[in-house]
Amino acid sequence: MNQELDSKFSKKLRGVNLGGWLVLEKWMTPSLFEGLQATDETSYCVELGVQAEPALKKHWDTFITAEDFAWLAKTGINAVRIPVGHWLFGADYPYHPAYGALPHPFVEGGVAILDRAFDWAEQYGLLIVLDLHAAPGCQNGFDNGGILNVCEWHTQEDYINYALLILERLAERYHNKPALHAIEVLNEPRWDIDTQLLKKYTTEAYHRIRKYCHAKDVAVVYHDGFRSFREYTGFLTEPEFSNVVLDIHRYQCFVQTDIDLDIYGHIRSSVVDWKNEADDIIQDGHSTYVGEWSLGLHLKFVSLWAEGPFTDTLQAMDSFQKSLAYRAYASAQLMTFEKYSGWFFWSYKTETTPEWCFRECVNRGWLPDNFANEALGQDNN
């Protein structure tokens, strides 16, 4: 990495995701879905029809505000990762059968909200990682990909090409914004999508973004696709490619062997297994973000696709012991994730799940109340 690039991007990102805002997730904002059969943003817009517009615009205006950016800056957070859907720029996206009789069901106007987020970020000194979270046809079958139980993004050239077009539009629109730090080409493509297809897409995405965003100004980020980082050894490396970041997501609540751990096992996984993994990833030459992590230890209120039973490792603890456990688990993860170039808690705000709500974790004392360099390691009481 050249000296100019190294200087700008040596700053460690300590961030949060602004999930559930411009891409809906039912578990994060259940009040929006009350009385509906909808499970994701697609079915939400299809079911509500014209009524979706006032509901979503109210949500966009109130769920995240300038006050939230101010609070994050005060707390020492220096970056936000903002998930966006392929429908962000309006109604020219390809049709999917899930839309039914509506050729373009999604509510328009999200791009103006994103414009406002850039203004707030600049005002309060936060950096932004833009994240294509929901691609046409859905890339993972999760609700956060736009269509639950559908994974067809990789099966049609129209879907793939439109995702690339959205990345190019994002780069063109925001390349002059001081807050733009990185663009992520696709969130969590499913584990069974061919690695070579993902590499081809990511390489093309890199070139599309670089048409407007120079390497000295903006990083290009790609997710590991739920496979070993070793499958990307030597991928998109210098000198032909520059300022490329690998994104990994680390949770201990989606696999039964993790869910069955007691709190000591969760802590050990964080400070031993994940620490050793971090050393290996760094040794392999990858600049890396942990783009998502949380304090979640079970899926009872979170997952629409996982089946129970949902073991709660803290169920037998009293409130004081639970607080200790969450603080220890948070510290264990942070000790490891600080080895990377940056991390982003999932998510900043939820309605009902404090373990997944950064602001609530801070308020409850599970996470530090100041993440600025000068505050770390000091008594902030």
What do the PLM-derived regions correspond to, one by one?
Residues 165, 172, 179, 186-331:
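Extracellular glycoside hydrolase catalytic/binding regions
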